[in-house]
């Protein structure tokens, strides 16, 4: 394997959330990550959960994440830290969330105060956790669920940001977030926000006649064209990010609702590769062909269907093989380590929330309440990495079940 694939196999999971919800210490789950043969891990590190305000850490959260990161270093697992929540200034309807006030670059505006708080928050975070090699400074900002107007979720949700408004705001946020990270830890690398699919209902602005996953390339073109326009903070993409991230999920090409795009998907083929190559073509067009790419989320949900579980294990191996032969890809983070049964109590993506049946069954292992038993995709990934670890045993030792 060539040098840029040394950290190719990755996996993501909000392990501190799992510790808080289910009592098993977060760092113990890293034995599952290592058992899979993965040496990269994407950690949910929300600014608003680790910090009380942009300069003050929550001591409990600081201790938890430090434990997790210390264990990752012991196991030689590289960590990408990701946050998709931030603080908002007094005068906004919300104190925090995925929201921003109306874009207003006037000094002292609520919008500028929010950007300044974002910069300071990232400075604090990067300084607190020098163990984190890469900071992914946003998540799916091309979608309404992850970037919307202040107070949106408490409204009838009929007036999201337009795609142009979202991309303008995303460029601003990346610039200020990157400044903060580099102030806090000049040695850390900054990954762009990670765009995902685009549909008319979910947001993103992709013309309706394209397959939804070309929303990634579309979003990147919108971002790059703004940076290079001379109308934003800098025309140098390095001032916004060092690496580029995106989410190349496999979706059905059938005409279905947004909620069902994950369901009963077809076998990934060269079209899946081209979704990714199209995004990279955008990078090259704007002079960024030398930057590495993190595929920070991709995976499959079988919704508890045994036939889908078996089929998707094969699909997972196929996309790993494709990605291994994409020279620009540094790491592929499989989503996600664990099933989460609690997702059944949450609303789904069509309500701009993350929950429902499809969100339960992305896991490589069962929910801890079911013993963290390896599922078919876990064995498929272990086969790809060459791991001979006893995944059943690791799960039993972890949960005592």
Residue ranges and their predicted role:
Residues 1-44:
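Boundary/entry segment of secreted carbohydrate-active catalytic domains
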Residues 7-13, 41-43, 79-83, 133-137, ...:
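Hydrophobic faces of well-ordered beta-strands that scaffold small-molecule active sites
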Residues 33-204, 251:
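Substrate-binding cleft and catalytic face of glycoside hydrolase catalytic domains
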Residues 36, 68-78, 124-132, 173-188, ...:
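A structural motif corresponding to the C-terminal end of an alpha-helix
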Residues 118, 267-356:
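Surface-exposed substrate-engagement region within the catalytic domains
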Residues 146, 152-161, 311, 326-401:
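Aromatic-rich peripheral "rim/lid" segments of glycoside hydrolase catalytic domains that contact
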Residues 164-309:
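Noncatalytic carbohydrate-binding groove/subsite architecture in carbohydrate-active enzymes
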């Amino acid at each position: 394997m060539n040098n840029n694939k040394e950290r190719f196999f990755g996996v993501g999971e909000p392990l501190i959330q799992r510790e808080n919800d289910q009592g098993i210490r977060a760092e113990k789950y890293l034995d599952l990550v290592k058992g899979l043969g993965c040496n990269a891990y994407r950690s949910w590190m929300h600014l608003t959960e680790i910090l009380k305000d942009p300069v003050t850490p929550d001591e409990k959260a600081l201790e938890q994440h430090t434990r997790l990161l210390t264990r990752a270093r012991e196991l030689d697992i590289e960590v990408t830290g990701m946050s998709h929540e931030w603080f908002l200034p007094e005068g906004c309807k919300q104190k925090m969330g995925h929201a921003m006030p109306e874009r207003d670059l006037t000094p002292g505006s609520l919008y500028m105060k929010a950007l300044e708080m974002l910069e300071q928050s990232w400075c604090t975070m990067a300084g607190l956790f020098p163990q984190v090699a890469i900071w992914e400074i946003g998540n799916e900002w091309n979608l309404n669920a992850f970037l919307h107007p202040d107070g949106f979720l408490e409204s009838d949700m009929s007036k999201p940001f337009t795609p142009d408004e979202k991309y303008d705001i995303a460029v601003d946020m990346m610039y200020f977030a990157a400044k903060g990270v580099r102030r806090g830890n000049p040695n850390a690398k900054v990954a762009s926000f990670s765009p995902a699919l685009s549909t008319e209902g979910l947001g993103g602005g992709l013309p309706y006649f394209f397959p939804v996953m070309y929303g990634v390339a579309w979003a990147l073109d919108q971002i790059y064209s703004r940076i290079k326009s001379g109308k934003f903070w800098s025309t140098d993409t390095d001032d916004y990010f060092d690496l580029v991230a995106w989410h190349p999920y496999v979706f059905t090409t059938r005409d279905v609702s947004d909620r069902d795009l994950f369901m009963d998907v077809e076998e990934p083929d060269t079209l899946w590769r081209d979704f990714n190559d199209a995004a990279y073509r955008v990078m090259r067009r704007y002079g960024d062909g030398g930057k590495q790419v993190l595929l920070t989320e991709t995976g499959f949900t079988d919704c508890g269907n045994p036939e889908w579980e078996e089929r998707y294990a094969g699909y997972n191996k196929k996309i790993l093989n494709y990605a291994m032969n994409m020279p620009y890809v540094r790491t592929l983070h499989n989503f996600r380590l664990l099933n989460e049964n609690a997702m059944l109590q949450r609303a789904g993506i069509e309500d701009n929330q993350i929950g429902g049946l499809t969100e339960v069954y992305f896991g490589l292992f069962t929910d801890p309440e079911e013993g963290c038993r390896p599922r078919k995709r876990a064995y498929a990934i272990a086969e790809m990495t060459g791991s001979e670890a006893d995944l059943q045993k690791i799960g039993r030792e972890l949960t005592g079940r």
